[in-house]
Amino acid sequence: MSNYRVEKYTKENRLAWDTFISGAKNATFLFARDFMEYHSDRFTDYSLLVYKDDLLYAVLPANIVGDKLYSHKGLTYGSLVLSKSAKLLYTFEAFKALLAFLDAKAISSLELRNIPTFYNTMPSDELSYFLFKANATLIKRDALMVIDTSTKIKFQKNRREGINKAKRNGLTIAVEHNFEGFWNEILIPNLQKKHGVAPVHSLEE
């Protein structure tokens, strides 16, 4: 029977982490350590590595707030990241080992934001199934849309009319390298009005 071990990420794991992410079936550049550590001053990292028979089998990008673990509040999404050779039964055991680790560390809850499936390089619905089996609570669901650029999309008539109207009224589109006007007059007021938040990044960033 396989042995599973969970460890908290340290800087000594950086190369192993990034190498694993580059070959995973459900990961993007957001999970690379350079990107994750960009906001290291705002989040307490508590990323986890899961080993199967001493080989890295899965990783969980995560941060901790009190006794609650999130995957990951500094990223658009998080997930249990798996290698391309991952098998359902082994992944189930790895996930159980991860939950047991959190319980042993007195972590009261785990909140996950699954990576959208269109980013996966291979089918990878294991985590959704495990969350169902664990009777997890769904607290939010986002609507996502993707454009398949290999398929021609019909142009709606009202869109064409909008373009023609813009041309008649002298609307022009130009490349602009000064973002200050957009930042202060459009982005900040709209984020505040619609969502009650400020931009995550500063204009300088």
PLM features per residue range, with description:
Residues 3-53, 57-68, 114-142, 146-205:
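A conserved beta-strand-loop-helix scaffold within acyl/acetyltransferase catalytic domains
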Residues 67-135:
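Acyl-donor binding region in acyl/amide transferases
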